Amino acid sequence: MKTASILGAAAASLIALAAWAEEPAGSGWYAGGAAQLVLPQGGSRMRRLGGGAARAGRYLTDSLALECEAARLEDSAALAARAVWHLHGWEEFDMLFGYERFDPFLSAGARGWMHDGQVGPSAGLGAFYYLTDDWALRFDAEATLGLDTRVETVYSISAGIQWFF
């Protein structure tokens, strides 16, 4: 319950901050879903888990977004709050060899696992592939560090779709 409260407060803070941010080119909001695979390292009751995740967020600038995620796995659930930073510098190199629909990003934040109450910092990388201006495929790889727990690190990979509105 403590983990849920902490992550809930973090998520509410991110959404409140996003509501006061300067409006980017579009409305700035997005939502999506993904299939997710979690690979824990170290000793724990956690095992390899497959499941799904739902994400929602808002762009504060053209490069920076804040998002929240809720994941339901086989025997666990997770909540996360993170910042997503898009790497627009590659545009200087001819859109990465002509792939103008490809959009790489870095992410950093916190994730909590409900089965044992652990919360830890997370970092990752990923990419969008834009199908249209409103729809994109999203691929992520993330590592979450376990603090004060037997699980040292939890790796996750996900693939899904995202809608910008």
Language-model segments: what does each one mean?
Residues 20-60, 64-66, 70, 110, ...:
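Short glycine/proline- and aromatic-enriched beta-strand/turn motifs that initiate or cap beta-hairpins
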Residues 22, 58-124, 129, 163:
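Gram-negative (and chloroplast) outer-membrane scaffold detector with strong preference
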Residues 29, 50-52, 64, 79, ...:
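Hydrophobic core residues within well-ordered beta-strands of beta-rich domains
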Residues 42-48, 117-121, 149-155:
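Outer-membrane beta-barrel translocator domains and adjoining extracellular loop/strand segments
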Residues 130-134:
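A short, structured loop/turn motif at beta-sheet edges
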Residues 140-142:
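C-terminal binding/interaction regions
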